[in-house]
Amino acid sequence: MPILMPSAEVPTIDISPLSGDDAKAKQRVAQEINKAARGSGFFYASNHGVDVQLLQDVVNEFHRNMSDQEKHDLAINAYNKDNPHVRNGYYKAIKGKKAVESFCYLNPSFSDDHPMIKSETPMHEVNLWPDEEKHPRFRPFCEDYYRQLLRLSTVIMRGYALALGRREDFFDEALAEADTLSSVSLIRYPYLEEYPPVKTGADGTKLSFEDHLDVSMITVLYQTEVQNLQVETVDGWQDIPRSDEDFLVNCGTYMGHITHDYFPAPNHRVKFINAERLSLPFFLNAGHNSVIEPFVPEGAAGTVKNPTTSYGEYLQHGLRALIVKNGQT
């Protein structure tokens, strides 16, 4: 069962000290992260150094210029049986059934000669891209953005590490750029005069995506100006405030697993709002063979109970379970 979070407060945390040399300032940020992670489970990361206006411009341009044929050619196996990809590719809207559409891409380091690609290890795919003559700035931007968000997320993880009583570089090795299974999803929610049927929560709220826990170490999300997210708390479902400038950060179930839910994955959902908007999550994942042994965080009670599992095994099982629960996105 998901953990009901004690608060709906979502603080904004200046993460820039985590990239500096001031140990006291780093510890201060770590304690702010600790409070947020054990409160609502969410915080906004400010002073992140990412050009979010350029991000919006490129993603809007991409969605605006994609033809139906291009979408089909790039569609994942669930929508196009000629494409073996199950992660990287286009996730199509289906008229009368499903309005949301998205493009997901993986680590640019995954090339044909990458050991995990050569061995056909699950969850690893060489990215397919739209025609670069028709979309000249899309691939270069996306590959650079991936590396920016990996660096940003690694810095944020140093704050989590300090908050857990570990060295600040505790997670660095598991997040090496050559092997990380992290992904970016460029999700578009359209405005439609006639919207397909949407699901309804137990409390009567219409939903674009039902309640779920993220399958990740952490999720680092940028979204445009429409408020739509809710977190499940001891007082029921509560709105998460929006931000036009900052990245929303929360733990995924792997952090919950290795910390024995000292830092739980907050249960959250997406309200249905008929408005044009973008949701752009970066799901931070370790490498396939990475193993982080569960531990009892500093200051927490209890003993180690959770089993050790490789990250690849965790991710494959978790993504399958999410599709079974909430359906194919």
UniProtKB/Swiss-Prot annotation:
Top class in the EC scheme: oxidoreductase
Transmembrane intervals: none
Cofactor or coenzyme needed: Fe cation; L-ascorbate
Positions that bind Fe(2+): H212, D214, H268
Binding positions for N-[(5S)-5-amino-5-carboxypentanoyl]-L-cysteinyl-D-valine per the UniProt entry: R87, Y91, S183, Y189, H212, D214, S279
Binding site for 2-oxoglutarate: R277
The entry's keywords: Antibiotic biosynthesis, Iron, Metal-binding, Oxidoreductase, Vitamin C
Superkingdom in the source lineage: Bacteria
Fe2OG dioxygenase domain residues: 180-286
Pfam families in the record: 2OG-FeII_Oxy, DIOX_N
GO biological process, one term: antibiotic biosynthetic process
Reaction(s) this enzyme catalyzes, per UniProt: N-[(5S)-5-amino-5-carboxypentanoyl]-L-cysteinyl-D-valine + O2 = isopenicillin N + 2 H2O
Pathway of action: Antibiotic biosynthesis; penicillin G biosynthesis; penicillin G from L-alpha-aminoadipate and L-cysteine and L-valine: step 2/3
EC number: 1.21.3.1
Annotated InterPro entries: DIOX_N, IPNS-like_FE2OG_OXY, IPNS-like_sf, Isopenicillin-N_synth_CS, Oxoglu/Fe-dep_dioxygenase_dom
Biological role: Removes, in the presence of oxygen, 4 hydrogen atoms from delta-L-(alpha-aminoadipyl)-L-cysteinyl-D-valine (ACV) to form the azetidinone and thiazolidine rings of isopenicillin.
Family: Belongs to the iron/ascorbate-dependent oxidoreductase family.
Name this polypeptide is given: Isopenicillin N synthase
Native species: Streptomyces jumonjinensis
